[in-house]
A protein has these predicted regions:
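Conserved beta-strand segments of alpha/beta enzyme cores
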Residues: 30-33, 103, 138
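Intrinsically disordered, low-complexity boundary segments flanking structured domains
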Residues: 18-21, 101-106, 124-131
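Cysteine-nucleophile active-site neighborhood
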Residues: 54-123
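Conserved beta-strand termini and adjacent loop/short-helix elements that scaffold enzyme active sites
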Residues: 35-37, 107, 142
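A generic structural signal for short, solvent-exposed coil/turn residues
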Residues: 1, 24-26, 96, 109, ...
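N-terminal beta1-alpha1 cap of cysteine-dependent amidohydrolase-like domains
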Residues: 1-82
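An acidic, glycine-rich "communication" segment
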Residues: 110-143
Length: 143
């Protein structure tokens, strides 16, 4: 019998649970553990096969208002160094980038929705790069 996959989901807003991510994991019968980063203790990342970091209203460049992001970035940096795949969505992507000293800067105006993504050579080789999604038509609908 094969061991069930375990995914850790890090959420930032209590009213913003796993949503579609949780539904997809449920569909594939993948166990997930959902924790709120600002409230819950971060578990040992080696207990999981992957980590998904959700969005939120925080910003990586606003650490005095969101001090938990410092701890979260260190946690994500260590998880990746231990070989655990991580996927960041919205704020989660900012946190992952910032954890590895990539430039994350404030947009001139608030943006909610989709932006075009460009991959580096290394990004193209990453199994979590979602290349197919990013090369799909410019618009699509989600249920």
């Amino acid at each position: 019998m094969t061991e069930k996959k375990r995914v850790l989901i890090l959420e930032h807003i209590l009213e913003n649970p796993a949503g579609r991510v949780g539904a997809i994991l449920d569909e594939y019968e993948i166990f997930y553990h959902l924790i709120h980063v600002g409230r819950d203790r971060l578990p040992d990342p080696t207990r999981y096969n992957a980590i998904i970091v959700l969005g939120g209203s925080a910003h990586v460049y606003d650490k005095h208002r969101y001090p938990y992001t410092v701890r979260e970035e260190a946690y994500l940096h260590q998880a990746i160094k231990q070989g655990i795949p991580c996927l960041g969505i919205c704020l989660g992507g900012q946190l992952l980038a910032n954890a590895f000293k990539a430039e994350v800067k404030k947009l001139p105006k608030v943006h909610i929705g989709f932006l075009e993504i460009h991959f580096t050579e290394e990004g193209n080789r990453d199994p979590l790069s979602l290349q197919g999604l990013c090369r799909s038509p410019a618009s699509f609908s989600m249920a």
